[in-house]
């Protein structure tokens, strides 16, 4: 399945280690997904009927709905940490509003759970990482 890749504005990107589908490691450019690509990847792997976009507390968020609970997926791309770090180091950059949003959800919408999801993509290989909220 092909997902939309974000076009890089900065042509000074540094190559870093990438994981191929067969688990081989190559050195190449990151291939972060667009916000819509993230949404489509989540829908593809979690089920079209289970994943939707909703406005909750004035924020447009992705919601995973299983039969037990609604989980807000605050998802961002995993990319290279940048120079001067080793080429295997990756990161996820979480916007400041994520923490405020989580605190507001706990107070105002306790029926929801919130997850920080990192999405790594390279040549069709997708890896999802569920981060621990308490570390944010």
Locations of the language-model features?
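Intrinsically disordered, charged low-complexity linkers and terminal tails
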Residues: 1-136
């Amino acid at each position: 399945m092909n997902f939309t890749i974000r076009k890089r504005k900065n042509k000074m990107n540094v190559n870093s280690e990438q994981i191929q589908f067969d688990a081989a490691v190559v050195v190449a450019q990151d291939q972060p997904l667009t916000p819509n690509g993230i949404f489509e990847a989540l829908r593809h792997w979690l089920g079209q009927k289970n994943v939707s976009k909703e406005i909750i507390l004035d924020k447009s968020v992705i919601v995973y709905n299983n039969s037990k609970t609604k989980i807000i997926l605050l998802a961002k791309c995993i990319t290279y940490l940048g120079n001067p770090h080793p080429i295997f180091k990756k990161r996820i950059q979480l916007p400041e509003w994520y923490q405020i949003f989580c605190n507001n959800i706990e107070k105002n919408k306790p029926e929801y759970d919130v997850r920080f999801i990192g999405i790594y993509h390279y040549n069709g290989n997708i890896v999802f990482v569920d981060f621990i909220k308490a570390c944010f």
